[in-house]
Amino acid sequence: MDLNDYRKEIDSIDDQLIALFAQRMETAEKIAEYKRANGLRVLDARREKEKMRALMDKTPEDLREYVSSLYSLIFELSRSRQSCLLGTKGDLPAKIAEAIEKTPQLFPEDAAVACQGVEGAYSEQACERLFKRPSTFFFSSFEAVFSAIEKGLCRYGVLPLENSTAGSVNAVYDLMTQHNFRIVRSVRIKVDHNLLANPGAKLENIREIYSHEQAISQCAHFLQGLPNVKVIRCENTAVAARMVAESGRDDVAALSSRACRDLYGLDSLAASVQDQGNNFTRFICIAKNLEIYPGADRTSLMMVLPHHPGSLYKVLSRFNALGVNMNKLESRPMPDRNFEFMFYFDLETSVYAPQFTQLMGELPELCEDFSYLGSYSEVI
């Protein structure tokens, strides 16, 4: 036999597999009707374990890993089909539908907005991209921004979530597990760092540089060229610029924005010192209540999964089975649980798609703890 003969044999086997798979799914549909009539849940974990064990007993040892992966996917597809036929369960899809109906058609042009830092911060630039006429209130910490939303001091809050060079803002992710909020929009801001100092200062005389840890990370290559300079972290790039201006010293500088240069009367000793030219930070806009504006095509979730093998795989398989694209997966350790994590997901799917509604009805059953953070669009 030559290669073409082997391929024809594979084609013949595939024809049989398709017919058998269709037959299996038809039987799964009958099981779904039985479960509907008898008030049974779609997922029967014990049955799946027993079935997988029986399959492994019948499978040659060198193929068990492959058969296990194959049937894990078949089980997932079967559950997805049954869930689709039985309709969504739980109250989350209904809450989302209600929010879509009650949310105004247009995103607000003006609002009270909480930001971390001081005037000139990149968060302020994000506010101005999101709102035409924001009333911006500055707070000393990320946690204070979350608290301002929870207490009703501001309707919205703007927080940095990730940077294209330095990665995730871990402090914000950790706080997300501790507060009640909803994401209503996001925006990407181009970040251009400059070395700012008081008028008359010279680069060769600089002994200390202040900035936020993310900015320091984004300018690592530039800072390596200044080995005798002490780099000091502070709360915010705008705070760093203000500290330098208020110090009156000619031997200190800040990594900050051009806006802060003009705002605080500083000179730029070096421009665009970030490692990557295309350096963007993604900010989220949070609110106390769920607001879903037209065009929402991104959804954020947090989950605590059962602490056993395959838990994350089952969630990812559910995304795959429904054709939902995942843009981001982040894990953060949970302080009160040894070696357990909170998983953060960004999904790309329209809130109007039937697979989105089905997914929101199914996911809570796969988790120990599930948080729907919101569905929104991103300003780019």
Please annotate each region the language model reported.
Residues 1-380:
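Domain-level signature for soluble enzymes in the chorismate/prephenate branch of the shikimate pathway
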